[in-house]
Regions:
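Bacterial N-terminal signal peptides that target proteins for export
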Residues: 1-2
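C-terminal motif of bacterial Sec signal peptides marking the signal peptidase cleavage site
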Residues: 11-14
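Acidic-enriched, low-complexity/disordered segments with a strong bias for Aspartate over Glutamate
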Residues: 16, 23, 65, 70, ...
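N-terminal Sec/ER secretory leader and immediately downstream segment
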Residues: 18-167
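A cross-kingdom marker for long, charged
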Residues: 18-41, 203-335
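Extended, low-hydrophobicity segments enriched in charged/polar residues
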Residues: 123-228, 232
């Protein structure tokens, strides 16, 4: 866990719309804090785990090198051509997205080539088998080891917008669905349109969705837990005018602003996270660092950021309901 630096803090205190939600949340706690019965401050900004560095998320793949004589004997089929593409100057520095497409091409070329030399045929057959086993890792490298993933998972872009809705993520959903189809058919060596594949990675990058969601639910959790802990100590002595004030603040800040925003975030995440988690699974085995990072998005793991956010939301609702019930007051908006 890392305390967020000066850039984010400056954004929160300024007019940066990426942190508009922070103002809404701090107004909620500030409103409660004006009562003499509680002291609740905005929680410190503490970051969730960030995307691991490239060397901690890239999986090593088997290199395929052929000698000159073998290369000449393979010119009768596509193996020599495809292998030559990888061994070129540009091929040696190809990005992971292109390396994934190359892996598909070289396996397809080897398995379709009629090789006269039994020794060479056995060698290439072994290489193709090994590369088939590594395809999920090549796929994961393409998804999670480029500049696109760094933007997609970046925590420096703030919250999902206050007015965010599922209507704004259709392009992202389409891209994720296409990527899942590819990952789910690796054993069949899918024919992948390079321009569409690269375009889908660009869509992920431009959306900045995963990092924004992770930052959003982390801050929501912090605020909800802070409020829940504060009102947990209140008893019937605050019933009457003080409780009337709390009800007013709760309804004007939480029911009218925070809760609807959380509802939009939940609907959005329940569309995206199943696909994102599927992509993590289709890219297995991930590095230890990537497994730890990806676990934050799990819909089911008890220690995920998502589950902690859900528990914070439920406890917040339960605590307010208990307090209103204690003072025989009814209130709208809880679910």
């Amino acid at each position: 866990m890392i305390l967020l630096g000066g850039i984010i803090l400056a954004g929160v205190s300024g007019c940066d719309t990426r942190f508009q939600v922070e103002d809404v949340l701090s107004q909620y706690t500030a409103g409660l804090n004006r009562s003499q019965f509680v002291s609740v401050s905005s929680p410190a900004i503490v970051m969730p785990a960030s995307l691991p560095s490239s060397r901690h998320r890239q999986q090593s793949l088997t290199q395929f090198d052929i000698g000159l004589l073998d290369y000449l004997s393979l010119q009768q089929c596509n193996v020599g051509v495809v292998a030559g593409r990888k061994n070129s100057i540009l091929g040696k520095v190809m990005p992971d997205s292109q390396r994934f497409l190359y892996e598909l091409d070289i396996i397809r070329a080897i398995e379709s080539c009629d090789i006269q030399s039994d020794t060479l045929a056995d060698e290439l057959r072994h290489i193709a088998q090994q590369k088939r086993l590594e395809l999920p890792m090549a796929f994961g490298n393409a998804l999670f080891n480029g500049a696109e993933s760094e933007a997609f998972f970046s925590l420096s872009n703030g919250f999902l917008p206050l007015n965010y809705s599922t209507a704004q993520q259709q392009e992202l959903m389409n891209a994720l669905n296409r990527l899942v189809v590819i990952g789910d058919s690796l054993d069949r060596l899918p024919i992948v349109d390079a321009s569409v594949f690269e375009g889908d990675l660009k869509i992920l990058m431009d959306s900045e969705y995963a990092g924004r969601l992770l930052y959003t639910i982390t801050r929501l959790t912090d605020y909800l837990e802070r409020v829940t802990h504060t009102i947990d100590g209140l008893d019937q002595s605050i019933c009457g005018a003080p409780m009337g004030y709390f009800k007013q603040q709760y309804e004007s800040h939480y029911v009218e602003s925070v809760q609807p925003y959380m509802g939009r975030i939940n609907r959005s995440a329940y569309q995206v996270l199943p696909l994102l988690n599927t992509l993590f699974e289709l890219s297995a085995p991930l590095s230890n660092e990537m497994r730890f990072f990806s676990q934050q998005f799990s819909l089911t793991a008890a220690d995920s950021r998502w589950q902690r956010y859900q528990r914070a939301s439920q406890e917040h609702a339960r605590q307010w309901s208990t307090l209103f019930g204690r003072c025989a007051m009814s209130v709208g908006g809880e679910s």
